[in-house]
A protein has these predicted regions:
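N-terminal beta1-alpha1 cap of cysteine-dependent amidohydrolase-like domains
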Residues: 1-129, 139-142, 147, 151-186, ...
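Conserved loop-to-beta-strand segment in the C-terminal subdomain of adenylate-forming
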Residues: 239
Length: 269
């Protein structure tokens, strides 16, 4: 773990220490509910790309899948951190918009569960990282809205150039933001390459959120909860609370996942 990550993860961080007594922090990860086939079976499943669990484990945490069920937000009281994972599109009805023909993969049960999880995590001050769809969920949970199909807005498909895989594009990170500190660039604004696969993005920012990274075409690529700083809980109790539109678990740079786990460990240290 880098010096910058330790500095910005939160107070009380110590290498190799998560929960009090040296236990590893428990990180809940929101998941899909889909039909899947394996071996002789074809059944309704709760699933998640393994790279999420592998990244949390490599960062020193214990990953726990959170199925999209009513009342799952009660799990927040038993977690040290939360990842709002990627997935299909959020139902535009959640932010008062009509359905765009390009909006796809809507799962109302997942929307309801993750919006409740996001709100509960912020209220409790749980260390929280939104990834891709997770950023969009966090924004909608705070009353924001989404662009439903970016090619219609920016005139290209550079944010989702590969079907079934990830492309790459640079993002500009705001100097002196929490994100810049985690990535080791707390000074002047810098550009970093990120793995990308999304066709929706933030339109109107939700209450208490600030944008901290953008692509050259103006699309918001990261948000942070205002007042959630390295010195502890901020407004509405939020401590480490940020989200990115890209997929850090799919890339080589794992500093965001390490910072989340470190911040989660500080809650029980």
């Amino acid at each position: 773990m880098t010096t910058e990550t330790k500095q910005h993860a939160g107070p009380g961080w110590r290498a190799g220490n998560g929960r009090a007594g040296g236990g590893r922090p428990v990180i809940g990860i929101s998941s899909y509910a889909e039909r899947a086939s394996w071996g002789a079976w074809d059944a309704a499943t709760v699933l998640l790309p393994r790279r999420y669990a592998d990244s949390v484990t490599a960062a020193g945490g214990i990953p726990v899948l959170l199925p999209p069920l009513a009342g799952i937000e009660e799990a927040v009281a038993r977690l040290d951190g939360l990842i709002l994972a990627g997935g299909g599109d959020v139902d535009p009805a959640e932010f008062g918009a009509r359905l765009d023909p390009q909006t796809q993969g809507i799962r109302p049960d997942r929307d309801a569960a993750e919006l409740a999880l996001a709100s509960a995590a912020l209220e409790r001050g749980l260390a929280c990282l939104g990834i891709c769809r997770g950023l969009q969920v966090l924004n909608v949970a705070r009353g924001g809205s989404l662009h439903q199909h970016l090619p219609d807005l920016v005139g290209h498909d550079g944010h989702s150039p590969v079907s079934g895989g990830y492309g790459s594009h640079p993002v500009r990170v705001a100097p002196d933001s929490r994100l810049a500190g985690v990535l080791g660039h707390p000074g002047p604004q810098v550009e970093i390459p990120v793995p990308t696969h999304h066709h929706q993005a933030v339109d109107r920012l939700g209450e208490g959120l600030i944008a901290t990274a953008w692509t050259a075409d103006g699309v918001i690529e990261a948000v942070e909860f205002a007042g959630a700083g390295p010195d502890g809980p901020g407004r509405n109790g939020a401590g480490f609370a940020l989200a990115v539109q890209w997929n850090p678990e799919a890339g080589q740079d794992q500093r965001l996942l390490r910072a989340l786990v470190a911040a989660a460990g500080c809650r029980r240290a």
